[in-house]
Swiss-Prot record:
May help in the organization of the PsaE and PsaF subunits. It is found in: Plastid, Chloroplast thylakoid membrane. One of its GO terms (cellular component) is chloroplast thylakoid membrane. GO terms for biological process: photosynthesis. This is Photosystem I reaction center subunit IX.
Length: 44
């Protein structure tokens, strides 16, 4: 039961950090390349 409580307290924190960093990354990409359908650093 203690392991379940530890999991339930760690999972929301990790998911919040992950989704927050992912949202920040997407915001920064859209700030430098607004409305880009193709990104310059992906074209070879």
């Amino acid at each position: 039961m203690r392991n379940l409580k530890t999991y339930l307290s760690v999972a929301p924190v990790l998911s919040t950090l992950w989704f927050g960093s992912l949202a920040g990354l997407l915001i920064e990409i859209n700030r430098f390349f607004p409305d880009a359908l193709t990104f310059p650093f992906f074209s070879f």
